[in-house]
Each structure stands twice: as C-alpha cells, then as structure tokens.
Amino acid sequence: MARDDVIEVDGKVIEALPNATFKVELDNKHVVLCRISGKMRMHYIRIALGDRVKLELTPYSLDRGRITFRYK
C-alpha cells in the first residue's frame, strides 16, 4: 500500500555502507542516505554500485530515504 505523503525520485548508488545502507546521488546532484525496503530485503534483491534505483523520501527528512525499486 503506497503512502500519500512520500516523494518518489530516481538516483544512482554511489557508495555501499554497512547494514544494507547506501549513499545515492539523485538526478539533481543531491546525496541521500538510503536503506533497502523490507520487500526488497525479503526477496533478496541485491544492489551494487552504479545501479539506478527509485527512492521514497519523506517530507520531514529529505536527507534519508528508502530504496523501493532497482532498475534493470
């Protein structure tokens, strides 16, 4: 079920950090700290450096996000 108050943006993974956390550079050159969503973790979807991903940002904190989709 999608939330109404999230902001969906696309970006590119630039750094992998511990505990399934990544630094993602958005299309507008901002860098966001992101974690993998629960469904992606449950289905063992792997994310590597350079992958294009879709993120969800909340309006409350625009420097943290959740990775919800990895483009092929």
Curated annotation (Swiss-Prot):
Q: Could you tell me which CDD domains the record lists for this protein?
A: S1_IF1
* Stated family: Belongs to the IF-1 family.
Per UniProt, subcellular location reads as: Cytoplasm
Subunit structure as annotated in this protein's UniProt entry: Component of the 30S ribosomal translation pre-initiation complex which assembles on the 30S ribosome in the order IF-2 and IF-3, IF-1 and N-formylmethionyl-tRNA(fMet); mRNA recruitment can occur at any time during PIC assembly.
Q: What is this protein called?
A: Translation initiation factor IF-1
Query: Which superkingdom is the protein from?
Result: Bacteria
What this chain does, per the entry, is described as:
One of the essential components for the initiation of protein synthesis. Stabilizes the binding of IF-2 and IF-3 on the 30S subunit to which N-formylmethionyl-tRNA(fMet) subsequently binds. Helps modulate mRNA selection, yielding the 30S pre-initiation complex (PIC). Upon addition of the 50S ribosomal subunit IF-1, IF-2 and IF-3 are released leaving the mature 70S translation initiation complex.
The record lists the organism as Helicobacter acinonychis (strain Sheeba)
